């Protein structure tokens, strides 16, 4: 089925989508440094989206999941390499579908969660408070980690250097991260 869509819409696929995602992070960091108030208007907040600030459906992608540090820079370089490899392996269209559907499902899931929690906690919290609370947890962290897990599933025998010294097969990093996700839930 995806092959039919690929033949029809493959010409619209964005090459180097990972690079654009990382460039978005850089733009987001620059905005946060120059104008923190404007950066606050870019974040995801279901309450504000449902009250007219619809740009937040898209601009939350510019917000970084972590604060800027040397580890963030290393992470971005790693995700660029993993994303480029997945794009070459799967093809541009399928990689686009993978990332964009992850972004769309994140937005849909957050809005559904907001609506459900608004009804459940309507007497305890204001809908604006719930929107801010949910918005604080919506980031591209899980999108980035899904790139990592997809790479681990596609290339389980590849090695990463832990602390730039110890070679470990990426499948074990994937297993550890999968266990972390299950414990975190």
What is each PLM-predicted segment?
Residues 1-185:
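A detector for small-residue-rich transmembrane helices and their helix-helix packing motifs
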């Amino acid at each position: 089925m995806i092959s039919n869509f690929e033949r029809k819409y493959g010409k619209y696929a964005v090459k180097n989508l990972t690079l654009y995602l990382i460039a978005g992070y850089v733009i987001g960091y620059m905005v946060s440094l120059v104008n923190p108030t404007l950066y606050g208007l870019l974040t995801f907040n279901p309450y504000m989206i449902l009250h007219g600030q619809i740009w937040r459906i898209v601009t939350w992608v510019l917000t970084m999941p972590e604060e800027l540090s040397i580890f963030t820079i290393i992470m971005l370089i790693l995700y660029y390499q993993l994303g480029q490899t997945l794009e070459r392996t799967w093809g541009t269209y399928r990689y686009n579908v993978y990332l964009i559907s992850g972004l769309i499902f994140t937005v849909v899931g957050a809005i559904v969660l907001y609506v459900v929690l608004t009804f459940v906690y309507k007497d305890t919290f204001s809908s604006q408070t719930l929107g801010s609370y949910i918005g604080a947890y919506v980031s591209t962290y899980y999108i980035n980690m899904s790139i990592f897990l997809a790479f681990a599933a596609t290339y389980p025998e590849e090695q990463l250097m832990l602390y730039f010294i110890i070679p470990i097969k990426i499948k074990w990093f994937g297993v550890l991260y999968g266990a972390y996700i299950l414990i975190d839930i």
